[in-house]
C-alpha cells in the first residue's frame, strides 16, 4: 500500500472514531455485537475459554461469564480505573479499599456500594450493611451475590437470586421507539440508540432503541422461569451522552419525562401509589403531580434556611423530578452537564422513584440519593462552616471517611450545603 493511501485511511479512521458517539458504540441501536457477550465454541482467540481468566470462563447460554451480570461486567467494570470512566457501572474491589469510595458516578450509581459495610459506635454499635445500598445483582465472577435478607423484590415476587442486569435491561435491545412515540419489539429496524441528547430521532424508515435498552411490556429474561413478564412499558427519558462524571462543579441532568415509576412497578408492584391521598406510601408516578404548592417549594428551596431560589435555576440532580412529557425535543433540550438547563418544576411535574433513589446503588441505605439515616446532611466547624464531619465514628459520617461521603454526593463538598443541612426531602417539603 502506498504511503499516501495509508495516511488517508488513517485520517479517515480517526474521523470516524471522532464522529461516532462513544457512549453507545457497542450497543449502537440497542443490540451489542454477538461475540461481545457470547462464545460460539467455548473459545476465544483460538484458546479454550475455561483456560482463560476466571471471569471469562464460558457460562450458560454460551455467555462469556458465569452469569448474565458477569458477562455485562466483563465490559462495564475495569480494574485500574482511577475515577469515573465512561460506561463503567462498577468499581473493582482493589480500586476501592477501606476508606475509599467506589469510583463511578453514573446517574444510576456504582454497584460497588453494595460491598461497602460501615459501622460506628453511637449509643451502641450501628451498622449500615452493604447489601442495603443497592440492587444486589448476581455476578459471582465479580463477587456480587444475591441479597441475603430480601429474597424477593420489595412489594413484589421477583426472586432475588435471579436478579441480573438482564432483569431490567434487554441484552438484545429489541424494544424500539417509532416516530409516533409508540414502543414495540418488532417493526422497523433500529438505526441507533434513543437514550441520549445527541441521538438521532426515529424516522419513517428507522426506529431508535428504547431508553437504556430497558425491557418493556411483556419482557422477561429467557433464563427466568415462572410468570414475571413486565406489565408496563419503558419510560420516556433522555440522558446526556457524557454522564459518568463528578458533579463537584456542574450537575448531570437526566431529563426524566414520564413512566419511570410505572416501569419500576413491574417488579415492585405493591409499594407504588400514584394517586393522592395516601398515608401509607409516598405518591410516585404519572399521577403524582406536584401541583402549584410543591412546585413552588421545590423552586424556592436552595438549602436549609434559604428559600430564595427561582424556577430558572432550581433543578437539583439529588432530587430530580419527572417532567410529565414524552416530547423528546423538550427532553433533549434539558439533558445537560453544563448547568445551562436548570429549570425547575411546574405544577405538572411529578415525583418518580428516581427522585429519591438511584437505579443501581448509592452510598446510603435503601439506595437513596441522600442520607436519610441521620437528621443532618452536614454539621459545622467552630467557625460555622459546613463540614461532613471529622470522625467516622459519629452520627454525621456513620463509619464513612470524608472522601466516601463526598463521593456519595457525587463530588459535592460540604460547603455546597448549609451548615446543619437537613435531609433533602426538604427540597419538596421545606420543613427546615
From Swiss-Prot:
Tell me where it resides: Cell outer membrane; Cell surface
Q: What induces it?
A: Expressed in the presence of insoluble Fe(3+) oxide and during growth with fumarate as the sole electron acceptor, but not during growth on soluble Fe(3+) citrate. Induced in the cocultures with G.metallireducens.
Q: What's an example Gene Ontology biological process for this entry?
A: anaerobic respiration
Q: Which CDD domains match?
A: OmcS-like (cd21555)
Instruction: List the Gene3D superfamilies hit by this protein, alphabetically.
Output: Flavocytochrome C3, Chain A
Q: Which domain of life is it from?
A: Bacteria
* Manner of cofactor binding, per the entry note: Binds 6 low-spin heme groups per subunit.
GO CC terms of this entry: cell outer membrane; cell surface
Which residues constitute the signal peptide according to the record?
A: 1-25
Q: What is its main location?
A: membrane
Molecular function, one GO term: electron transfer activity
Cofactor list? heme
Describe what happens without this gene: Deletion of the gene inhibits Fe(3+) oxide reduction, but does not impact reduction of fumarate or Fe(3+) citrate. Deletion negatively impacts the expression of omcT.
Q: Which organism is it from?
A: Geobacter sulfurreducens (strain ATCC 51573 / DSM 12127 / PCA)
- Any idea which UniProt keywords this protein has? Cell outer membrane, Electron transport, Heme, Iron, Membrane, Metal-binding, Signal, Transport
Q: What does this protein do?
A: Plays an important role in extracellular electron transfer. Can transfer electrons to insoluble Fe(3+) oxides as well as other extracellular electron acceptors, including Mn(4+) oxide and humic substances. Essential for direct interspecies electron transfer (DIET) in cocultures with G.metallireducens.
The encoding gene:
omcS
Output this protein's name: C-type cytochrome OmcS
Amino acid at each position: 500500500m502506498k504511503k499516501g493511501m495509508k495516511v488517508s485511511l488513517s485520517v479517515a479512521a480517526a474521523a470516524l472514531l471522532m464522529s461516532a458517539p462513544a457512549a453507545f458504540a457497542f450497543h449502537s441501536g440497542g443490540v451489542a455485537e454477538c461475540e461481545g457477550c457470547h462464545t460460539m465454541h467455548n473459545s476465544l482467540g483460538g484458546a479454550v475459554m475455561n483456560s482463560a481468566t476466571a471471569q471469562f470462563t464460558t457460562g450458560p447460554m454460551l455467555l462469556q461469564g458465569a452469569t448474565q451480570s458477569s458477562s455485562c461486567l466483563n465490559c462495564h467494570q475495569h480494574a485500574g480505573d482511577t475515577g469515573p470512566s465512561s460506561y463503567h457501572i462498577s468499581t473493582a474491589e482493589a480500586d476501592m479499599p477501606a476508606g475509599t469510595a467506589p469510583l463511578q458516578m453514573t446517574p444510576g450509581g456504582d454497584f460497588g456500594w453494595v460491598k461497602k459495610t460501615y459501622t460506628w459506635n453511637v449509643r451502641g454499635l450501628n451498622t449500615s450493611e452493604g447489601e442495603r445500598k443497592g440492587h444486589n445483582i448476581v455476578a459471582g465472577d465479580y463477587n456480587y451475590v444475591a441479597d441475603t435478607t430480601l429474597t424477593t423484590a420489595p412489594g413484589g415476587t421477583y426472586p432475588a437470586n435471579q436478579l441480573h442486569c438482564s432483569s431490567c435491561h434487554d441484552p438484545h435491545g429489541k424494544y424500539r421507539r417509532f416516530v409516533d412515540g409508540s414502543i414495540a419489539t418488532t417493526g422497523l429496524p433500529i438505526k441507533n440508540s434513543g437514550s441520549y441528547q445527541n441521538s438521532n430521532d426515529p424516522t419513517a424508515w428507522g426506529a431508535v432503541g428504547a431508553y437504556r435498552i430497558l425491557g418493556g411490556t411483556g419482557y422477561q429474561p429467557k433464563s427466568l422461569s415462572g410468570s414475571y413478564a413486565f406489565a408496563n412499558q419503558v419510560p420516556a427519558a433522555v440522558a446526556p451522552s457524557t454522564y459518568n462524571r463528578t458533579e463537584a462543579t456542574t450537575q448531570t441532568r437526566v431529563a426524566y419525562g414520564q413512566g419511570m415509576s410505572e416501569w419500576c412497578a413491574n417488579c415492585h408492584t405493591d409499594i407504588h401509589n400514584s394517586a393522592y391521598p395516601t398515608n401509607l406510601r409516598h405518591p410516585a408516578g404519572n399521577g403524582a403531580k406536584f401541583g402549584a404548592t410543591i412546585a413552588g417549594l421545590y423552586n424556592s428551596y436552595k438549602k436549609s434556611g434559604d428559600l430564595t431560589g427561582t424556577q430558572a435555576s432550581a433543578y437539583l440532580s439529588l432530587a430530580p423530578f419527572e417532567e410529565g412529557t414524552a416530547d423528546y425535543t423538550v427532553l433533549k433540550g434539558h439533558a445537560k452537564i453544563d448547568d445551562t438547563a436548570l429549570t425547575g418544576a411546574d405544577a405538572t411535574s411529578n415525583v418518580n422513584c428516581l427522585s429519591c433513589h438511584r437505579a443501581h446503588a448509592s452510598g446510603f441505605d435503601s439506595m437513596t440519593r441522600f442520607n436519610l439515616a441521620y437528621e443532618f446532611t452536614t454539621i459545622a466547624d467552630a467557625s460555622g462552616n459546613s463540614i461532613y464531619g471529622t470522625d467516622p465514628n459519629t452520627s454525621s459520617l456513620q463509619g464513612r471517611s470524608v472522601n466516601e461521603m463526598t463521593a456519595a454526593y457525587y463530588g459535592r463538598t460540604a460547603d455546597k450545603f448549609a451548615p446543619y443541612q437537613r435531609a433533602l426531602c426538604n427540597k419538596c417539603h421545606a420543613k427546615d
